[in-house]
Amino acid sequence: MLYELNHAFDLAARDDSVKVLILAANGPHFSSGHDLSDRSGIQDFQAVGNWGGFEKPGAEGRQAVEEEIYLGLCWRWRNLPKPTIAEVQGKVIAGGLMLIWVCDLIVASEDATFSDPVVAFGVNGVEYFAHAWEFGFRKAKEILFTGGSISAREALSCGMVNHVVPKNDLSVFTDSLAQKISKRPSMGLRLAKQSVNQSQDAQGFWSALQSAMSLQQLGHANNEIVHGIAVD
C-alpha cells in the first residue's frame, strides 16, 4: 500500500490541475497502524532511496527496508511541493501517525484519537519519530511511556491538529478548506510550504528523525538477541 500511495502522491504532484491533496480513509477508523505482513515483495517496486540491501540478513537488511519504506517514503511525502491535508476519524495508531504527520494540515473528527503504543514492543516509537515536534516534549514522553492516547481536542490544544469538527461534517469541512487554499497562487503556496519546512529543518528536525531511526534499529537488534524476534 505504501508504494501505491507514493505513486498516487507522485501523480498528483506532477499534475498541474491538482492544487491541494487530501489524504483520507474509508471506514470508522483512519488507520490501525503498520501492516506487519511479509515484506518480501519490496523488490517488485521502484525504490525511492539508495540504501539497497533489502535481502541482507539481520539488522542490515531490516534497517535498509525500514529506511526505505518508512522514513524514506514519509520524508518524500512531507516535502511534496503542494499543500496536503489529512482528513482523519476514529483511531489513528502508530503507523497511522506517520501518514498524517507528513501532511501540512490535519482536520480531525471529534471522535479521533491518536496513539503510539509500540514502546511495548521494545522500541522507541514509530519510524518517522516526530513525536516531540507534534505533541510537545512532555506530552510525547507521556504518550510513549504509557501507551495511552490523546483526543482530537487535546491534539488541537498542542498544535498537532488544525481543526476538530463533527464526524458528519468532516469531509465537507475538509473539502471547503482545500477549496479555499486552492484559490491561492500555486507559487506562493509552494514557497510558503518550503519556507516553513526549512524553518523546521533548521531546528534539527531531519537529524532528529535519523537519530531516532538508528535507536529504533538498536531496539530491534536487542529484541532479536533477548527474545529471538525483532519485535518483542
Predicted segment positions?
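Catalytic-core regions built around general acid/base machinery
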Residues: 4, 8, 69-81
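Terminal peptide-recognition signature
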Residues: 4-5, 23, 35, 83, ...
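C-terminal alpha-helix plus adjacent terminal tail
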Residues: 30, 42, 147-152, 172, ...
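Hydrophobic alpha-helical segments typical of transmembrane helices
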Residues: 69-73, 127-130, 139, 191, ...
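Crotonase-fold acyl-CoA enzyme core
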Residues: 75-187
